[in-house]
C-alpha cells in the first residue's frame, strides 16, 4: 500500500488558465489512470484522502482542486462547471495522460460528464457517485429554491387558518 512518500503534490501551470494543485500516485505508470473530481465547496484532499491508498494499489491516481476551490485555479469571476472540466483536461494534457477514467463525486459528476462531452479523446470512462446531470436549475425551479427557506420560516409563524386557506 502506498505511503505519503509515494504521492507527489505540486502545482502546475495550465497555459492560459493559471496554476492548480495536483496530487498523484507514483505507482506503475502503465496502470490505468483514475482522475478524481471532488464536490462543491471541498478540495480533492478532503473528498478523496481516505481512498488514495486503496485505489493506488491497482491504478495510477490523479486528484486536483477545481477552479475556485482549495489550491485550484484562482477564479476572477464565478466559476463554471465547464471551466472545471477544461481545467481537468488541461491537467491531463500537462501530465501526458493519454486516456483515463474520470471519477466524479457530487459536483464532480457533472464535471466528469462535461469533461467527457468536451474532451472525448482523453476520457475512456466515467464513474459517477452521488451526483446529478447538472447543478444549475433553470427559471422557476431556481426561484423556488431561493424562496423555499423563506416560505418554510413564514409557515412557522403564520396563523393556522392562513396555512389551511393557502393549502386549499
Model-predicted regions and their roles:
Residues 104, 108, 112:
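Gly/Ala-rich beta-loop-alpha elbow adjacent to hydrolase catalytic centers
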Residues 1-19:
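N-terminal cap/lid segment of alpha/beta-hydrolase-fold proteins
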Residues 153, 159-168:
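Helix-loop "lid/cap" segments that line or gate small-molecule binding pockets
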Residues 46-48, 72-78, 137-139:
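Conserved catalytic-core motifs of eukaryotic protein kinase domains, centered on the activation segment
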Residues 82-99:
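Conserved acidic catalytic loop of the alpha/beta-hydrolase fold
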Residues 113-118, 122-155:
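Flexible "cap/lid" loop of the alpha/beta hydrolase fold
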Residues 15-71:
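Conserved HGGG/HGGXW glycine-rich cap/lid loop of the alpha/beta-hydrolase fold
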Residues 65, 101, 124-127:
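Residue in the alpha/beta-hydrolase core beta-strand immediately N-terminal to the catalytic nucleophile
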Amino acid at each position: 500500500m502506498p505511503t505519503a512518500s509515494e504521492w507527489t503534490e505540486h502545482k502546475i501551470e495550465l497555459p492560459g488558465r493559471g496554476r492548480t494543485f495536483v496530487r498523484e500516485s507514483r505507482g506503475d505508470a502503465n496502470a490505468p489512470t483514475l482522475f478524481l473530481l471532488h464536490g462543491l465547496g471541498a478540495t480533492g484532499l478532503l473528498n478523496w484522502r481516505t481512498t488514495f491508498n486503496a485505489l493506488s494499489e491497482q491504478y495510477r491516481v490523479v486528484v486536483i482542486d477545481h477552479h475556485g476551490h482549495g489550491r485550484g485555479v484562482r477564479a476572477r469571476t464565478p466559476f463554471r462547471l465547464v471551466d472545471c472540466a477544461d481545467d481537468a483536461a488541461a491537467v491531463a494534457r500537462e501530465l501526458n495522460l493519454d486516456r483515463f477514467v474520470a471519477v466524479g463525486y457530487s459536483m464532480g459528476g457533472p464535471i466528469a460528464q462535461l469533461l467527457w462531452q468536451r474532451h472525448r479523446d482523453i476520457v475512456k470512462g466515467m464513474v459517477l457517485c452521488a451526483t446529478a446531470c447538472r447543478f444549475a436549475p433553470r427559471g422557476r425551479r431556481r426561484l423556488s429554491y431561493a424562496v423555499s427557506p423563506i416560505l418554510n420560516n413564514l409557515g412557522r409563524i403564520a396563523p393556522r387558518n392562513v396555512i389551511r386557506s393557502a393549502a386549499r
